[in-house]
């Protein structure tokens, strides 16, 4: 086993592995432990009391975080007609139809979000095997299939988080950067938790929010006391 670095040892001294921290203390500790030379992301993982194998307990959606994520998002839009200029004016990185489809089929997939207007889905549908495995397939449930492409692009660019419970019933999401102040990070987390609360499946029984943990890109994972959140 490789020997721990001095930075790793310092983090271990600061972190109590079995402790459940208040959200304020957890975020302050992550910021204190952030030693990378880049602006690390702050990520949250929430264990939900759902049976992810049941289709009626599929938790997914999208929410615009009030303070953004601090991430530069590259957006591709499939649309035509008047929507081309609207998407471009909203900040889309590339807009197209068959030409964009061909580009993606050839391997140009350096996009974080793909948006499509309904009249473009005939083209986008041919990219199912390309976009689907990468989580890029436009979907009306998360607002990426819409006639209002300008709003969709703006949302993606200004901090929209798309989330989906995995097979274990856990939702993972980026909620900001270590450079954000604690208040901004807390607000983002509260907004995302409230969004999850609103779409709790009616068939899900028992405790819905089971466990919350947060971490930074290079830092420790910390358990958070759910009672310290405004939900």
Curated annotation (Swiss-Prot):
A GO molecular function held by the record: tRNA binding
Protein keywords: Repressor, Ribonucleoprotein, Ribosomal protein, RNA-binding, rRNA-binding, Translation regulation, tRNA-binding
Pfam families according to UniProt: Ribosomal_L1
Gene Ontology CC annotations of this record: cytosolic large ribosomal subunit
Coiled coil: none
Highest taxon in the source lineage: Bacteria
Family: Belongs to the universal ribosomal protein uL1 family.
This protein's name: Large ribosomal subunit protein uL1
Upper taxonomic lineage: Bacteria, Pseudomonadati, Pseudomonadota, Gammaproteobacteria, Candidatus Pseudothioglobaceae
Gene: rplA
